[in-house]
């Protein structure tokens, strides 16, 4: 019998976090080569400061090193500075380490609060 896809999901972020001025909050997640149809979905809302803004990005762990240091990086998702954001992006199959980050490094004085939920979804082939 041929293998069939089984859907899995995992919360990457849920609830509320504080992101200080000049700082970032991030979560690292690992994808295995057996994962297929990988998608990150979710919603977030930001409070704090005059602009109530944050930047959400998803990229590989190596690109995150460049991003964190202010260098050019390849990202699979970039919200830009925003108050409210919806994430619905695919990540290429093949495995690797990735990072979901909420960036407030551009804020000189104001910390931000980010509320929301972001989920990693994928399929793995298995026997019925």
For the regions a language model picked out, list residue spans one by one:
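Acidic, Ser/Thr/Pro
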Residues: 1-128
